Regions:
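Thiamine diphosphate
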Residues: 1-142, 170, 229, 256, 381-502, 506-512, ...
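Flexible, low-complexity linker and terminal segments
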Residues: 1-27, 139-350, 355-359, 364-368, ...
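Short, glycine-/Ser/Thr-/acidic-enriched flexible segments
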Residues: 36-37, 85-86, 111-114, 141, ...
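Short acidic, glycine/serine/threonine-rich loops at helix termini
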Residues: 41-44, 67-69, 90-94, 116-123, ...
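Short helix-loop-beta junction
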Residues: 44-51, 246-259, 461-465
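A glycine-rich helix N-cap at a beta->alpha junction
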Residues: 50-57, 100-111, 189-195, 432-443, ...
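Short beta-strand segments
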Residues: 81-82, 107-111, 164-168, 236-237, ...
């Protein structure tokens, strides 16, 4: 323990612990892209950037990591803050950075949305540890978050690769004490001798020099801990779920069960897990959101979890753990098979005073395939509007519409256009596709807190000569019918034309 390490008498939330770790690890450069549950963390980091680091909102996760890598190779510790689907976007430079090597430490915070409260999927960022061959931490408590960041920067510089830390909303909201210690300024540098190696040679170097360091770290870290029991039943967990498991095991009927909590899960700690399983007759794996740990150990025949139906896929609650413990005698159960519907969950409709409501009402009455995007427009897909047919990913609307069998319409927000949708528009022009693109410009990322969106109108007009700009008035029942009729006539006329047409709709988000 460092000499200056000390418990802070105040209890911190997970998000506050992350801020403290950024300050104490002497981070100098932070980039982030808005998206639940990462937005609140990035906003806090922006608020406190006078603490010695610079922080920047970025338009897209790939550029966020690339900018951080630029900071790294010039000696600045950097952090990248994204939501889980943002990991998909930054995966290209992440994969190659492992071969390329870095300079000062790079830590990526991946905000997972277990329960899909505000996301298009529930993907589990832990799998990026295996895919990218990087260390990945899954802390359980505010102290675990703080310690993970401090360890991650040191490990990143030793192994010369980025490190990923997975967080969730419940972890960020949880409270606990933090053992603080101040690290020295980094002296890590980027070694240009890497260019003496071929690409294959770089990968060989990684497995000879970097991977052994990561494997040693996961087998020796204090972040992975065992609470022994006096029964032959054991539980393995990771992340915030470890807290729920501990609470369950405080009940008298389950108090004797052993608990192995993994807060560093990549590289997978096979030795520790193998030893734990060998001492148990039965093992329950409790984790969010996919069976990452379970898939590594299911072949032992002792393990139960998501794959056996004992634990639900997605978010895990305390009652799920209790039910699983009560039914360990069953080899497989089918309790968690009911599919959630919008009716059972409750609808999340568009704001009734949205300036773009006339567009959605218009689209609902046009017999044309409409590709939506990961913004407010996706809320027009369910009943009662049913105005949008598809919605795959942020920035996907234009390319999706270009693939329709017959000419279709793409509806995309200005932030999604800047994030990645502009590439789809460039391809549409280059391929001479038949498509009508409706761009909703309110100059903010309305779904993620109102971050400013770049204005690409001049770029779009340069790309597409057939670009029309319309002002959308504040929505009222009096203005709706006129605006709806005007849009319907315009869109139908564009559908009769060949090539790419763009309709820019300018409106002000009433939430901002």
């Amino acid at each position: 323990m460092p000499d200056d390490a000390a418990f802070d008498t105040k209890a911190f939330t997970g998000i506050e612990a992350l801020l403290l770790s950024v300050i104490d690890s002497r981070v100098r450069f932070v980039t982030g892209v808005a998206g639940y549950p990462a937005t609140a963390l990035m906003e806090l980091l922006l608020k406190h950037q006078l603490e010695g680091y610079k922080a920047f909102w970025m338009t897209n996760e790939k550029t966020a990591l690339e900018k951080a890598l630029g900071a790294s190779v010039t000696g600045q510790r950097s952090m990248v803050v994204v939501k889980h689907v943002g990991m998909n976007v930054l995966s290209d430079p992440l994969m190659t950075s492992v071969y390329h090597t870095i300079g000062a430490g790079v830590v990526i915070i991946a905000g997972d949305d277990a329960g899909a409260r505000a996301s298009q999927n529930e993907q589990d960022s832990r799998f990026y540890g295996s895919l990218a061959e990087v260390a990945l931490f899954d802390p359980a408590t505010p102290r675990g978050v703080y310690d993970a960041v401090m360890h991650a920067f040191q490990l990143s510089e030793q192994a010369k690769v980025p490190v990923v830390i997975r967080i969730t909303d419940r972890l960020l909201d949880s409270k606990g004490h933090v053992l603080r210690s101040r690290q020295n300024e980094t002296t890590a540098t980027f070694d240009k001798d890497i260019w003496k190696l071929t690409t294959k040679g770089k990968h060989q170097r990684f497995h000879r020099e970097s991977m052994p360091l990561l494997e040693k770290a996961v087998q020796t870290t204090s972040l992975n801990w065992l609470r022994p029991g006096n029964s032959r039943m054991g539980i393995i967990s990771s992340g915030y779920i470890s807290v729920l498991v501990d609470k369950a095991l405080s009940e008298p009927r389950w108090k004797g069960h052993a608990h192995l909590s993994l807060q560093m899960v990549s590289p997978f700690p096979f030795d520790m897990v193998r030893q734990f399983i060998s001492e148990c007759d039965e093992v329950l794996v409790v984790e969010e959101t996919e069976p990452y740990i379970e898939s590594h150990v299911a072949v032992t025949g002792k393990v139960k979890g998501k794959m056996t139906g004992h634990i639900p896929y997605g978010q895990v609650e305390a009652e799920h753990i209790g039910y699983a413990l009560d039914h360990l005698g069953e080899s497989r159960i089918g309790k968690y098979t009911e599919v959630q519907t919008i009716k059972s969950r409750g609808s999340r409709p568009l704001c009734q005073d949205c300036p773009f409501m006339p567009l959605y009402k218009c689209l609902a009455n046009i017999d044309v395939m409409v590709a939506g995007d990961m913004g407010c427009s996706i809320r027009a897909a369910p009943e009662p509007l049913q105005a949008i047919d598809t919605g795959f990913a942020l920035g996907s609307a234009i390319s999706t519409a270009c693939g329709f069998k017959d000419k279709g319409i793409a509806v995309i927000g200005d932030f999604a256009l800047a994030h990645s949708g502009i590439v789809g528009l460039i391809n549409a022009v280059g391929s001479v596709d038949d498509v009508v693109v409706v761009i909703l410009q309110n100059r903010v990322a309305a779904m993620t807190g109102g971050q400013e969106a770049p204005d690409l109108m001049s770029v779009v007009k340069t790309l597409v000569s057939d670009t029309i700009v319309l002002e959308m008035p504040a929505y009222t029942s009096d203005t709706s019918n006129d605006a709806e009729d005007r849009l319907k006539g315009l869109l139908l006329s564009k559908m009769d034309q060949k090539g790419v047409s763009v309709v820019y709709l300018l409106g002000k988000c009433t939430k901002q």
